[in-house]
């Protein structure tokens, strides 16, 4: 892996990340393909939208179809038909979202949400699975506490995250993939600082900010991000896990973050909402019924070049899956174009102006006509 910061504007930065399956320009948004697919979209759709990297989920793939099936195909890239870089998460976030966990320093024991069988996941198993998947970027196994956890619970999770990070690094025996460490610490400044110092002391290829944007106040999200970034090395990529709205991405880029992922754009598309350069657009609303406009006049995606708001409103109104497909394609295309403009504004020294304009647009309540 190679990472080079090419340009800065304040703390915002443009970089180039070279990975085994291709080059990724940062800041970058990564569409989420939980089960080795971005919902409703083909790899060709993603490529035409300009996606340079996607995220897939170790936890779900480990359970179904299982590592052996993916290994049979020659790895995750061939299994899902995607030739560009892939980042896999470690499974920690999903595991700690499940009820009735047994957690100790060895790992986590839980019931499979698929068939109820007992499953054990540890740093070593997570690394083994991710290496077998063959993703470009793997994530260390971490303990992500709930957003309402008290100080002592978060402190214990932070210490365990450090111990598990050491074991993840030790178990990561491959030269063809890279490993990112994850900083935890909840919403407690001293624990965020402590975790950042601990994780960076191990030495990873990149660093992720975990355990945020999971229900806490936005002001706390930004404060904890600032504290964390202060202790991360300048020459390594910084990844905010789970940040996906345009407004949040702008705030995080302004604080020095490089990489983002979220199901947000495709999830809201499936519920009839489009992201546009004028804000959110509700395609369920009746005012679209007679509109011959595209979803976004500034967008060049397949959806906007070929279909009207009226048609997509009709599809959504009738429950036709094509409406969800077309909006998913548009929203992913928008996010890729949005990140293009983020990078351009940093390169031109106009990022703060761009950020202010877009936050005003997205805080105004969205498009109504």
From Swiss-Prot:
Transmembrane segments: none annotated. The active site is at residues 89, 261. Substrate binds at residues 89-93, 142, 184, 211. Its EC number is 2.4.2.29. It holds the Pfam family TGT. It comes from the Bacteria. Residues 242-248, 266-270 are annotated as: RNA binding. Its cofactor is Zn(2+). Keywords: Glycosyltransferase, Metal-binding, Queuosine biosynthesis, Transferase, tRNA processing, Zinc. GO terms for biological process: queuosine biosynthetic process; tRNA wobble guanine modification; tRNA-guanine transglycosylation. One of its GO terms (cellular component) is cytosol. InterPro entries: ArchSynthase1/Queuine_TRR (IPR050076), TGT (IPR004803), TGT-like_sf (IPR036511), tRNA_ribo_trans-like (IPR002616). Zn(2+) binds at residues 299, 301, 304, 330. Belongs to the queuine tRNA-ribosyltransferase family. Catalyzes the base-exchange of a guanine (G) residue with the queuine precursor 7-aminomethyl-7-deazaguanine (PreQ1) at position 34 (anticodon wobble position) in tRNAs with GU(N) anticodons (tRNA-Asp, -Asn, -His and -Tyr). Catalysis occurs through a double-displacement mechanism. The nucleophile active site attacks the C1' of nucleotide 34 to detach the guanine base from the RNA, forming a covalent enzyme-RNA intermediate. The proton acceptor active site deprotonates the incoming PreQ1, allowing a nucleophilic attack on the C1' of the ribose to form the product. This is Queuine tRNA-ribosyltransferase. It comes from Thermotoga neapolitana (strain ATCC 49049 / DSM 4359 / NBRC 107923 / NS-E). The gene is tgt.
């Amino acid at each position: 892996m190679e990472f080079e910061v090419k340009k800065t504007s304040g703390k915002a930065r443009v970089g180039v990340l070279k990975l085994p399956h291709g080059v990724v320009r940062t800041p970058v948004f990564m569409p989420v393909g939980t089960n080795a697919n971005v919902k409703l979209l083909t790899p060709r759709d993603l490529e035409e939208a300009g996606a340079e990297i996607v995220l897939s989920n170790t936890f779900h793939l480990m359970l179904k179809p299982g590592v052996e099936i993916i290994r049979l195909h020659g790895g995750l890239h061939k299994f899902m038909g995607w030739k560009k870089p892939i980042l896999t998460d470690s499974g920690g976030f999903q595991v700690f979202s499940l009820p009735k966990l047994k957690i100790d320093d060895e790992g986590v024991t839980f019931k499979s949400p698929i068939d109820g069988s007992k499953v054990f996941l540890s740093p070593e198993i997570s690394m083994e699975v991710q290496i077998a998947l063959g993703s470009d970027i793997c994530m260390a196994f971490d303990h992500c506490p709930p957003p309402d956890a008290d100080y002592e619970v978060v402190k214990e999770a932070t210490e365990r995250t450090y111990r598990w990070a050491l074991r993840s690094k030790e178990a990561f025996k491959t030269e063809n993939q890279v490993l990112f460490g994850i900083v935890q610490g909840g919403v407690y400044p001293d624990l965020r600082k402590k975790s950042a110092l601990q994780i960076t002391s191990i030495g990873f290829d990149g660093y992720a900010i975990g355990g945020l944007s999971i229900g806490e106040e936005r002001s706390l999200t930004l404060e904890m991000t600032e504290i964390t970034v202060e202790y991360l090395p300048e020459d390594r990529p910084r990844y905010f896990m789970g940040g996906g709205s345009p407004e949040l991405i702008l705030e995080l880029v302004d604080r020095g973050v490089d990489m983002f992922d979220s199901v947000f754009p495709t999830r809201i598309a499936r519920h009839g909402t489009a992201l546009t350069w004028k804000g959110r657009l509700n395609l369920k609303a009746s005012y679209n019924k007679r509109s011959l406009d595209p979803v976004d006049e500034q967008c060049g995606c397949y959806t906007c070049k070929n279909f009207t708001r009226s048609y997509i409103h009709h599809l959504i109104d009738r429950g036709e899956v094509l409406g969800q497909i077309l909006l998913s394609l548009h929203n992913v295309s928008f996010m890729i174009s949005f990140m293009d403009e983020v990078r351009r504004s940093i390169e031109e020294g106009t990022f703060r102006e761009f950020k202010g304009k877009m936050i005003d647009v997205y805080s105004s309540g969205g498009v109504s006509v």
